Amino acid sequence: VVPQGGNTGLVGGSVPLQGEVVLSLRRLEALSAVDQAAGQVTVGAGVTLARLQDHAGAAGLAFGVDLGARDSATVGGMIATNAGGLHFLRFGGMRDQVQGLEAVLADGTIIRHLDGLWKDNTGYDWGRLLCGSEGTLAVITAARLRLVPAYAERAVALLAFMHVTDAIDAVWELRRAVDSLAAAELFLGSGLELVCERLDLPKPFPETHQAYLLVECAGKADPTDELAAAVAQLGRLVDAAVADPGRRQLLWAYRERHPEAINLVGPPHKLDVTLPAARIAEFVEQVPSIVSEVAPGARCWLFGHVADGNIHVNITGPAPDDEASDEAVLAYVASLGGSISAEHGIGTAKKAWLHLNRSPAEVALFRAIKSALDPEGVLNPHVLLPDAP
């Protein structure tokens, strides 16, 4: 049985491979009234992120996770992959939003813990175990989620730098100086040029620079002055644009529409990695040459949630079944002490490289947990765990 939500995953986690039954959860669309006292809501697994955001907003609250695929991504899939997204810096990922779950085990047993108590020290936190389990342990059918304050006042700025290192240094300076910082996104001059050219967007600055940061602040009071003051203190900043409310969406488009523009070049190999803070700049600067060594002529497109170390690596040029560039990048990530999967999960696409991050003892533990909850191997049998030797 392969559980399936909005089909926005990028590692094949909800794709049947050998005649499995697809279990669509899209019709589990129940939404409870928002519990204003607790700041929580109970939702069905098939509710889209956009619908959840609208529901929370109507109650004067917000949901802490946001994704570019908000119109299609569903709550169940986001929990199953422990999605991160644009505001991880401020609110964390899906595991941090889950107060309780309802799920169905492989034998049909329904387990439910949706009371939403903030403190409940009564045994194993099985709900958090299911976050990131990719449908291998149980089928998530509903969730109790925490909501966050709706920060109506926002400030967005696009910052340009001559060097990647300067942009990375600026992130840490802004994190220290700006309490209201909600997002910090990195992309490169090559990516910005591609987005503007392929999607007919105006260039934000007269000249193209090597690296850009898109930063957003959010608060009850207007954070524009706080952000502007911090930006004024940044070293090696070569240009900046602080958006008025009418231009915020355009500045975000330069970052959010990267995948759309890259797809117009050709089918990309998509990698989603995390680096230690001290190695991010080195990775961004070196990975194109790492790719070129094994795939001459390939193009590397880099962007991501830099404040939490998450870089998306898109590679165009190699054939879909040519994994030499994937192998080279993921091995390089591991050599720097990073993770081969930041937020997309392992699925079928990355399980061959799980050993780069997880020891044999850890993989054995994973198998033991899987065997305990799904002894017949019914649930999503071909994802996450490497094929048995």
Model-predicted segments: where are they?
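Noncatalytic alpha-helical scaffold of FAD-dependent oxidoreductases
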Residues: 1-389
